[in-house]
Amino acid sequence: MDKGKQIYGIDISKDVYDVCTPEGGLLQFENSEGGFRAFAKAIPKNAHCVMESTGYYHLQLAYFLSDRDFAVSIVNPLKIKRFIQMNLSRIKTDKSDAVWIMKYGASQDLELWEGDSELMQENLQLTRLLSVYIKQSTQLKNKIHGEHTLGNPSKVVVSSLKRQLRSLSKEIKKLEERLGENVRSEHQKSLTLLKGIPGIGEKTAISLIVLTDNFTRFDSYKGLCSYAGITPVIRESGSSVKGRPRISKMGNAKLRNLLFMCSFNACRFNTACRALYERLVAKGKSKKLALIAVCNKLLKQAFSIVRSGLPYDPNHCSVIK
């Protein structure tokens, strides 16, 4: 770590955020533009601000500080939790969180956080809103089906639901078109390469590019698989294994669900994925576990192909272990 940096641990909540100074002092600011300005005035230019990734709450402050040339690092909350456990602390309050974040930052070589470009920020926002609208669309379809099962559905109710569904479908189409235009404007080559992988369609390819920032967020496909939550977790104690191996499910649920849907077509049309699926099923593995392995294989193919810039080759992919 740069010895010239002054570590400030920041614990952020919806309305306020607590700050632990390098000397261990505690400060509190409003989680607002005014609070950001007050904090920026209170710290030196060589301050290194360390905070946990807390959904949306940390982003505004992170961008504010980064835009003003302060060093910013964003840490996975699990790392802070493990750091606290390693130091045998049983007392955990909001203000002590800021202390532990500062201590963690002072003891680690931290990567500097770089904010996304404006286009990338829009792509992520479009992706999140699409997820909301698609979920609402599914709920409306289920509601319409439920009304028809009543035997004598109200025409007023059904008409209203259908109007809402049509309106939502139009919005989904607009957002998908905008997202596609954005991705094609910067990552057309990657999009073409991904669509060349049997089992991966255009929507999935676009989502992969957006969620992984064109596969630049990860140094290896293993890190990407962990992010997707499709790595196996084995629970064991001593020499005894407690239960079957399961996937972690701690990663990005959207990415995991997309891959799972793609795995069905991949088993039919992707040479390597089909061979893997058939081999695992022949060994007595469950079909679901085999499909998860196919998800892992698909993600490995996608990572390798985009990073290398080489198109899909069934003969090459079939020997990837």
Could you tell me what each predicted segment is?
Residues 47-57:
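Short glycine-rich phosphate-binding loop at a beta-alpha junction
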Residues 2-22, 101:
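Gly/Thr-rich phosphate-binding beta-strand-loop-beta motif of the actin/hexokinase/Hsp70
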Residues 24-48:
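Nucleic-acid-processing active sites and adjacent nucleic-acid-binding tracks
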